[in-house]
């Protein structure tokens, strides 16, 4: 059976499996501030990244592109601190925001989160704390001690309150790593240097101390060895005993001489110190005693970072392989381990008590029983109370303490036991009952309350029942804590806390009998019953049936309470609650009608029986409520006529709920019953509902009762809003009949809805005394003529004067017209006009009189108004008309009068005298009217003069429209008459613009020729000359040349450009030539006429440089390069040298180009010119001139020219140029092309450029100059990027030997790199495999192993392949290769060395199979090597299958110590086969893991007796005693048979063996069996058997021994019984605990307790002196 371990070891993840580069797993790049996150800085390609691994989701690492020197994650949240140089930043990753930043003055060499919001910063000189909250800067805590100078800082720790700070560093001194620490006290501000490697702080509460102590633990590996120190820092808190210092040795194995502590964490849960060393060892120490609990190696690699593992209260760390490992205390095993393995029961007890750990149950039980048996009840009580997991807190323990009587003057052991339990915490259920029973019997209820408040008792239903008889409220508290719903609710009801019942029931999910509860509550208090009932129905789903609840109310005749309950319960007005609503109203209508009225008034309910309630309301005198509920018309009419009993406002609203027919019937009934009383209410109803009842029906209703008063008031209420003409008419009628004349006037004046004709006729027939309503109607609706006739014929002339004077004076013209129609006297009319003068429209008056041809009637009145200074146009218009008709000098009036309306008077004159109409229209600038008159009467001369004088472009545009049929005669008059007469330039300008705007070019030319060519005032006008030429260009191009030659005062450049745009190139050329603009002239010839010959002739004629330049440019564009260059030379113009050079390059005119560039160089020393001149000289092969030129002063780009010459293969010229600028790289390339290899190599050496070396090298290879090629190649191969191309170049041409020679020569170079060694290895594999092994053995560390692996595999170099796999740590592939190619690759030592390192264990079994097939004699050696990781069961099964077990017997013997079943059985089978019974017996005794029964059954049939003996031994070992004894008897193994029978403890088997001995007459054996099986045999049976077989002599020694033992037992029993009687007599005189008058637990300080003996195993119990407070002492 495997040994139990006190720790649990776990690998959480492998960082390399998450894609983390192994090179980045180290102290400088990986941080772990807690067990939540791991943070790694990596570089992927050129990008720096930070990888954050959340330990709760490790398979999804977070990668962020962050370039920082260091990154540490917050211990709890996704907040990261970054350091880059001296800049510190804190970021919140989830919020994607920067929280804080700071720039330090010194470099931070180490930093660490010391809490959730504080970072510690360590510089070369000091330590700072930086809070991430607020805006605070880092705060300096202390300066670094000189002892840490030059140390690498590896950790920084603080205690829980950050009062003690510790900085840890290491340094190399005297071939060992020395640890240095600086301990700093914040309160004292002092430091202490300490030698140490790892340390931590812990809070530990010693037994007997009230406060925790701050402990400082540190480990050191000095020259003398390792030590762990545990000390208390600072002054112990008041009342605390100081913690005794501990210093224990730390064991380091002999093979780990250089090992030292690197990390320490302390488990607060278990008070265990975890110490980790550099070599991967873990040590566990007890914090209190310093005892080493366990030590083992957990990692082959250094664990360089650790943190507390919160989930297990252990330690978690990362090693250099990337394993994330954790170690914690195995709670189930640590106590048994300390007890059994360490043999330290004291420590086991201590830890079990202190940390509540299981595993020490037997120790505690043994100690308790021992103390109890000794009578040390006080210590026994402490042991029982302190035992972990409450293993001794059982009813049996309480009964044992109850059975012990209390000593006089002392507290009983039971109460001592309870006192200790109360000190420690809560009592369990049984303990609480047993303690409370005597407390309540003594009336100490307050003690119980105190314990409940302190949560010292475990509440139960039984405890509640016990308390209830004393205090129901306290019992309620107990039931609540015990969660006994039925008892809780019962107590709530009994104590009147009904409001809590429903809430509690819902909370715990309990459903009691609510109706039963309600009856009980109602019996006690109706008000509380009502409250409880309301709580039952307050939810959407009532807890009880509401009908049953109402029945309970009615049982106690609680109408008021029931009403209040139902009002609340039925407030949601559900359809299903209709019967309950009816019941509520019914009970109140019978007993409290006013309450019912209020309920109905609130309209809370709608689902009750309305008919039944209506009848009850009528009986109760609630007519209004009855009407609300009646649906039958008969019932409604019966009630509604009693209006004196009803609220009028309500009754009006009530009618809104009736149908139209029912409403009219009720109104009719009300009017019939008492019209005087009910008329007003009927009018109100009619007014409000007239739209629904229809106004017509209501009018007919009132008319049927001849109630014009009702009709007037009804219609008066709606007439202001009604649009019905009949309503307005009926209202006017009713008002007339009731004498309301003022209302008639108002409605006639304001209403727009009545029929005016109908009202007019009614008012005429009504013969009212006041005609004002009629006047209003006629005035509003234009019945003035009828009104005048009616009033004039009825001799009511005074109303006519009233009308025009007071009502509407503006109607005077119509009235005058009417009076003229009835032949009224002119004097009357004139007087009427004079009376109302100025308040009417003169135009209308004139129109009315004019229609009747009586205009002269107004002449005196008009002249009088003008005399008065009237400027009204209408007056003057009328006067003008009279003068025109009477021909009273009208033209003078029209020209001089400024007030008349020209348009009106002109219109009046059109048919009478067109000339007068023109005068009137011209005076008023009535353009359109004047044009129409002139056109109709052919007055074009007048019109043309008017238009010229008017100067209106829009007016011109209207008459010059093509659609105007009078345009031509008008234009003729304008040209011949109007413009000839004018001297105003503006009039001419407007006219010309008008012709231009109208697009009349021919007419415009005609007009302009008249003006310009006929020697008028405007002949030399520049704009008119321009306009004439431009118009000709547009309209008649044949005249353009004539105008150009005749006219001189025009804008020549502008006109010429316009001519060009209209393609009149010859005209343009003539203009330029006339005005000597030669450059423009030649431009026209070149660009527009396109005749270069004419241009050349023109250039020769004028011989101007600018003209030659333009001609040259044109010739260049046409490709006439030679001619163009000649022209440029004549122009002496080098400005276009770039275009000339490009054209000459394209056409190859190099000789001409040389001439041009030489001319250009004289003008301008441009770099471009000189550069192109050099290239032109090279192209013309003038190398001597070229060399002379470049050796002289110049600005040319010689390098650029050299490159061009090189590109065009002019190598001689290029050679001169490159040599001139010392470009040895290109010079070397040029020399290569010239075949001068040696000179090319020299040039390449001077250039020292990789590209040049490559070019020269490749050229030398092509020229088979391998010596020179190697010289070049040695400069190339040192560049890894160029190596592949060079190798391919050699290989493609088959020069393998030369390539290998070059690479071999290159290996000794200073800059030799991995690629060279790799490629040479690959070449060896292909072309010289015999050299590859030697090369690899020398340089395997400098080759790219994966590439060489592929090459070796392709070349079938299996030995070399294995060698590489081994060096590359691909051990699996190495083994596979050796097994696949044993002839070439297998070597025994190498195979056994590599096989132990493989990752895939399956290869072990393939290796076994391989050895079995090829090297069977070496198989055991292999198995010995494989055994640590081999599955022995599988291996044995395999060898059994292939029947080779004997071959591997040495292996099986070597691994049998694992006690493997398959191994054991296989070896046992081999021993049986070899008949080696001694080896078989040894194997069986040493290793028990095999099928015992099967082996025994097999051996019992074996031919050799020793094997059958082993079978009996096996049967015995498996409790098959009978088979074992029978087998011994069969083989006469008497001694074995007796021994096995004795060991069986089976009396029957022993007696059967005795009988068998007698049957076989083996009397000596009989005698021996009596003593061997002495304890099993019954004396009477032995006596009978011996007597019957007459062998008493053989049995006599047995009987003597039996008699001796029995007599001794009887003597002891007698003495014991006597002692017991004496004790009973002494006990009867002492009282029992419950008979005491006072509870011993509350006896107070007067009870003295003697000092107790200490616990066993070195455990010291806490001193028990004064009683502890909190148990009810000092009552």
From Swiss-Prot:
In residue numbers, the region (Involved in binding clathrin light chain) covers: 1213-1522
The annotated region (Trimerization) lies at 1550-1675
Q: Please provide, alphabetically and separated by semicolons, the GO molecular function terms listed in this UniProt record.
A: clathrin light chain binding; double-stranded RNA binding; protein kinase binding; structural molecule activity
Record region (Heavy chain arm): 524-1675
Where in or outside the cell it occurs: the entry states: Cytoplasmic vesicle membrane; Membrane, Coated pit; Melanosome; Cytoplasm, Cytoskeleton, Spindle
Q: Which parts of this chain are annotated as the region WD40-like repeat 6?
A: 258-301
Region WD40-like repeat 1: start-end pairs: 24-67
Q: Which UniProt keywords apply?
A: Acetylation, Autophagy, Cell cycle, Cell division, Coated pit, Cytoplasm, Cytoplasmic vesicle, Cytoskeleton, Membrane, Mitosis, Phosphoprotein, Repeat
Membrane topology is:
Peripheral membrane protein
Task: Summarize the subunit comment.
Answer: Clathrin triskelions, composed of 3 heavy chains and 3 light chains, are the basic subunits of the clathrin coat. In the presence of light chains, hub assembly is influenced by both the pH and the concentration of calcium. Interacts with HIP1. Interacts with DENND1A, DENND1B and DENND1C. Interacts with ERBB2. Interacts with FKBP6. Interacts with OCRL. Interacts with CKAP5 and TACC3 forming the TACC3/ch-TOG/clathrin complex located at spindle inter-microtubules bridges; the complex implicates clathrin triskelions; TACC3 and CLTC are proposed to form a composite microtubule interaction surface.
Say where the protein is mainly found.
membrane
Family label: Belongs to the clathrin heavy chain family.
CHCR repeats (start-end): 537-683, 686-828, 833-972, 979-1124, 1128-1269, 1274-1420, 1423-1566
Q: Where is this region: WD40-like repeat 5?
A: 196-257
N6-acetyllysine: modified positions:
856, 1441, 1501
- Residue positions of the PTM Phosphotyrosine? 184, 634, 899, 1206, 1477, 1487
Proximal segment: region residues: 639-1675
Q: What is this protein called?
A: Clathrin heavy chain 1
Residues annotated as carrying N-acetylalanine in the record are 2
Quick one: a GO cellular component term?
protein-containing complex
Q: Which residues carry this modification: Phosphoserine?
A: 67, 1167, 1229, 1494
Q: Which residues carry this modification: N6-succinyllysine?
A: 737, 1441
């Amino acid at each position: 059976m495997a040994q139990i371990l006190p720790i649990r070891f776990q690998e959480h993840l492998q960082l390399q499996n998450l894609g983390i580069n192994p090179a980045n797993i180290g102290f400088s790049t990986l941080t772990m501030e807690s067990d939540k996150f791991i943070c790694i800085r990596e570089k992927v390609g050129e990008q720096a990244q930070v990888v954050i691994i959340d330990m709760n989701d490790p398979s999804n690492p977070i990668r962020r592109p962050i370039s920082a020197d260091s990154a540490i994650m917050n211990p709890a949240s996704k907040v990261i601190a970054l350091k880059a140089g001296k800049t510190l930043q804190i970021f919140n990753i989830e919020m994607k925001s920067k929280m804080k930043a700071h720039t330090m003055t010194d470099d931070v060499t180490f930093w660490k989160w010391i809490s959730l919001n504080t970072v510690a910063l360590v510089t070369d000189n000091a330590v700072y704390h930086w809070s991430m909250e607020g805006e605070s800067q880092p705060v300096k805590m202390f300066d670094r001690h000189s002892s840490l100078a030059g140390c690498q800082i590896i950790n920084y720790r603080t205690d829980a309150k950050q009062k003690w700070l510790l900085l840890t560093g290491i340094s190399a001194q005297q071939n060992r790593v020395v640890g240095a620490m600086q301990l700093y006290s914040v309160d004292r501000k002092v430091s202490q240097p300490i030698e140490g490697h790892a340390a931590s702080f812990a809070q530990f509460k010693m037994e007997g101390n009230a406060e925790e102590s701050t402990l400082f633990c540190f480990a050191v590996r000095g020259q003398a060895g390792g030590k762990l120190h545990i000390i208390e820092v600072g002054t112990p808190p008041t009342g605390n005993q100081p913690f005794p210092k501990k210093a224990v040795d730390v064991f380091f194995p002999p093979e780990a001489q250089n090992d030292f502590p690197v990390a320490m964490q302390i488990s607060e849960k278990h008070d265990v110190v975890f110490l980790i060393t550099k070599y991967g060892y873990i040590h566990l120490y007890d914090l209190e005693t310093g005892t080493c609990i366990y030590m083992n190696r957990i990692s082959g690699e250094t664990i360089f970072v650790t943190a507390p593992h919160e989930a297990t209260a252990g330690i978690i760390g990362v090693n250099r392989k990337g394993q994330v490992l954790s170690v914690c205390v195995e709670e189930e095993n640590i106590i048994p381990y300390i007890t059994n393995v360490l043999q330290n029961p004291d420590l086991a007890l201590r830890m079990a008590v202190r940390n509540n750990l299981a595993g020490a149950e037997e120790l505690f039980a043994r100690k308790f029983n021992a103390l109890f048996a000794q009578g040390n009840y006080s210590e026994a009580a402490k042991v029982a109370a302190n035992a972990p997991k409450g293993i001794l807190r059982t009813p049996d323990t309480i009964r044992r303490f109850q059975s012990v009587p209390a000593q006089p003057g002392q507290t009983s052991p039971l109460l001592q036991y309870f006192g200790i339990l109360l000190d420690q915490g809560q009592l369990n259920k049984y303990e609480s009952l047993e303690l409370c029973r005597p407390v309540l019997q003594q009336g100490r209820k307050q003690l119980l309350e105190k314990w409940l408040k302190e949560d010292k008792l475990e509440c139960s239903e039984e405890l509640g029942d016990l308390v209830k008889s004393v205090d129901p409220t306290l019992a309620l508290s107990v039931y609540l804590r015990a969660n006994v719903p039925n008892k809780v609710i019962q107590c709530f009801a009994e104590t009147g806390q009904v409001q809590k019942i429903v809430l509690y029931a819902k909370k715990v999910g309990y459903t009691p009998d609510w109706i039963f509860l309600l009856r009980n509550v109602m019996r006690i208090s109706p008000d509380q019953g009502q409250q409880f009932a309301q709580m039952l129905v307050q939810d959407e789903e009532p807890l009880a049936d509401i009908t049953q609840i109402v029945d309970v109310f009615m049982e106690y005749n609680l109408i008021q309470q029931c009403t209040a309950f139902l009002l609340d319960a039925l407030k949601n007005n559900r359809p299903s609650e209709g019967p309950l609503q009816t019941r509520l109203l019914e009970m109140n209508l019978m007993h409290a009608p006013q309450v019912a009225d209020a309920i109905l008034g609130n309209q809370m309910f709608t689902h009750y029986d309305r008919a039944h309630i209506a009848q009850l309301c009528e009986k109760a005198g609630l007519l209004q409520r009855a009407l609300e509920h009646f649906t039958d018309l008969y019932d409604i009419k019966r009630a509604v006529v009693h209006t004196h009993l009803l609220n009028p406002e309500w009754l009006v609203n009530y009618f809104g709920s009736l149908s139209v027919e029912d409403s009219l019937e009720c109104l009719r009934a009300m009017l019939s019953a008492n019209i005087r009383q009910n008329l007003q209410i009927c009018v109100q109803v009619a007014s409000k509902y007239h739209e629904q009842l229809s106004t017509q029906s209501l009018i007919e209703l009132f008319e049927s009762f001849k109630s014009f008063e009702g009709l007037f008031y009804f219609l008066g209420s709606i007439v202001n809003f009604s649009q019905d003409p009949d309503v307005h008419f009926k209202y006017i009628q009713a008002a007339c009949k009731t004498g309301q004349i003022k209302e008639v006037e108002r409605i006639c004046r304001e209403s727009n809805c009545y029929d005016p004709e109908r009202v007019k006729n009614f008012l005429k027939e009504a013969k009212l005394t006041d005609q004002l309503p009629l006047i209003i109607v006629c005035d509003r609706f234009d019945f003035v003529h009828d009104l005048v006739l009616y009033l004039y014929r009825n001799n009511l002339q005074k109303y006519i004067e009233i009308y025009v004077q007071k009502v509407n004076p503006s109607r005077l013209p119509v009235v005058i017209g009417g009076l003229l129609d009835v032949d009224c006297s002119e004097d009357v009319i004139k007087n009427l006009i004079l009376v109302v003068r100025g308040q009417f429209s003169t135009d209308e008056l004139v129109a009315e009189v004019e229609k009747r041809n009586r205009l002269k009637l107004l002449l005196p009145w008009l002249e009088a108004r003008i005399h008065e200074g009237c400027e009204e146009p209408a007056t003057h218009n009328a006067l003008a008309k009279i003068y025109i008709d009477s021909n009273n000098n009208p033209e003078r009036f029209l020209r001089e009068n400024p007030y008349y309306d020209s348009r009106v008077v002109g219109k009046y004159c059109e048919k009478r005298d067109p000339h007068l109409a023109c005068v009137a229209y011209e005076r008023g600038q009535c353009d359109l009217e004047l044009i129409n008159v002139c056109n109709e009467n052919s007055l074009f001369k007048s019109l043309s003069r008017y238009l010229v004088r008017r100067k209106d472009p829009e007016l011109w545009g209207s008459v010059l429209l093509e659609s105007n049929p009078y345009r031509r005669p008008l234009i003729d008059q304008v040209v011949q008459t109007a413009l000839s007469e004018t001297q105003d330039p503006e009039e001419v300008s407007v006219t010309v613009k008008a012709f231009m705007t109208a697009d009349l070019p021919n007419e415009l030319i005609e007009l302009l020729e008249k003006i310009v060519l006929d020697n008028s005032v405007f002949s030399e006008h520049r704009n008119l000359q321009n306009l004439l030429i431009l118009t000709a260009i547009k309209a008649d191009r044949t005249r353009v040349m004539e105008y150009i030659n005749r006219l001189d005062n025009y804008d020549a450049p502008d006109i010429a450009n316009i001519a060009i745009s209209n393609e009149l190139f010859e005209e343009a050329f003539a203009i330029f030539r006339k005005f000597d603009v030669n450059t423009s002239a030649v431009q026209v010839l070149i660009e527009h006429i396109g005749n270069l010959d004419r241009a050349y002739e023109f250039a020769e004629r004028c011989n101007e440089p600018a003209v030659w330049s333009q001609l040259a440019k044109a010739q260049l564009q046409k490709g006439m390069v030679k001619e163009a260059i000649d022209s440029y030379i004549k122009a002496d113009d080098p400005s276009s040298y770039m275009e000339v050079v490009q054209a000459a390059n394209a056409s190859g005119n190099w000789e001409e180009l040389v001439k041009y560039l030489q001319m250009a160089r004289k003008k301008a020393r441009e770099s471009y010119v000189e550069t192109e001149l050099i290239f032109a000289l090279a192209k013309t092969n003038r190398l001597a001139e070229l060399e002379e030129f470049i050796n002289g002063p110049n600005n040319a780009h010689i390098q650029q020219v050299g490159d061009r010459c090189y590109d065009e293969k002019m190598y001689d010229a290029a050679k001169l140029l490159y040599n001139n600028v010392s470009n040895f790289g290109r010079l070397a390339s040029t020399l290569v092309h010239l075949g001068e290899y040696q000179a090319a190599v020299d040039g390449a050496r001077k250039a020292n450029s990789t590209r040049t070396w490559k070019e020269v090298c490749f050229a030398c290879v092509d020229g088979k100059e391998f010596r020179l090629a190697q010289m070049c190649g040695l400069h190339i191969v040192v560049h890894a990027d160029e190596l592949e191309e060079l190798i391919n170049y050699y290989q493609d041409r088959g020069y393998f030997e030369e390539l290998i020679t070059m690479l071999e020569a290159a290996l000794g170079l200073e800059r030799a790199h991995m690629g060279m060694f790799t490629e040479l290895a690959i070449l060896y594999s292909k072309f010289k495999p015999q050299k590859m092994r030697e090369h690899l053995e020398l340089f395997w560390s400098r080759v790219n192993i994966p590439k060489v692996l592929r090459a070796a595999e392709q070349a079938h170099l299996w030995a070399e392949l294995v060698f590489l796999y081994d060096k590359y740590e691909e051990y699996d592939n190495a083994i596979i290769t050796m097994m696949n190619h044993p002839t070439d690759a297998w070597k025994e030592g190498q195979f056994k060395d590599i096989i132990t390192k493989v990752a895939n264990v399956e290869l072990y079994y393939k290796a076994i199979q391989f050895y079995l097939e090829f090297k069977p004699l070496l198989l055991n050696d292999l198995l010995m090597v494989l055994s640590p990781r081999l599955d022995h069961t599988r291996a044995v099964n395999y060898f059994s299958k292939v029947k080779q077990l004997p071959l591997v017997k040495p292996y099986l013997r070597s691994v049998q110590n694992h006690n493997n079943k398959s191994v054991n059985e296989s070896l046992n089978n081999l021993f049986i086969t070899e008949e080696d019974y001694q080896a078989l017996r040894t194997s069986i005794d040493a290793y028990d893991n095999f099928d015992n029964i099967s082996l025994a059954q097999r051996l019992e049939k074996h031919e050799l007796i020793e094997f059958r003996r082993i079978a009996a031994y096996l049967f015995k070992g498996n409790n098959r005693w009978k088979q074992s004894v029978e087998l011994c008897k069969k083989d006469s193994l008497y001694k074995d048979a007796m021994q096995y029978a004795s060991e069986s403890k089976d009396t029957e088997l022993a007696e059967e063996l005795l009988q068998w001995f007698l049957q076989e007459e083996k009397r000596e054996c009989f005698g021996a069996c009596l003593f061997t099986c002495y304890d099993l045999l019954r004396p009477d049976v032995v006596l009978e058997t011996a007597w019957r077989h007459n062998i008493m002599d053989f049995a006599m020694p047995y009987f003597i021994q039996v008699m001796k033992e029995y007599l001794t037992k009887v003597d002891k029993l007698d003495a014991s019984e006597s002692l017991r009687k004496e004790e009973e007599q002494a006990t009867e005189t002492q009282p029992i605990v419950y008979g005491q008058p006072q509870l011993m637990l509350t006896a107070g300080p007067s009870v003295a307790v003697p000092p107790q003996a200490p616990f066993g195993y070195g455990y010291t119990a806490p001193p028990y002196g004064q009683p502890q407070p909190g148990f009810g002492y000092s009552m």
